C-alpha cells in the first residue's frame, strides 16, 4: 500500500492518484506486470478531518497521525516543554475528531487505523475500539501492554 501524508484537500489526493495512474500506464507500456496497490492517507490536519467524508471516497484507508493532529488542532508546539501542561491529547475536540474520522471513513468504505502516541494509550484503548477503529498502531515496546488491555475488556457489552 501507499500512504500519502499531510493531505488537506480532495484535489491533492486526485492529483496524486493521477500520477499513480501515469506510472501504471508507463509500466503497462513496458509490459511490466504489477499488482493493484491500496492507496491511503494520513489524517493529521484539522482540514483533513473536516473533509474526511469526501476523502474517504477517494482512498482505501485512513491512518490517523494523532501527534500532529493534536498539535495542529490545539495550536501548540509539542517541542516546547513549557507547553507540556496544555498539550492534551485527551482534549474533547481531539476525541470528537477521532470519532468523526472513523465514522466518515467507514461510511466511505475505508479501513481506519490510529497511530501516534494515542494508539498506545491504554486509557483510551476501549474508547478507540468502541469507536470502531480497525487497528491500533503501537511501538513494539507497547504491544504487550495494549494486548493485555484489549484482553481485559468486555467488548460485547
PLM regions and their residue ranges:
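Conserved alpha/beta-domain cores
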Residues: 1-157
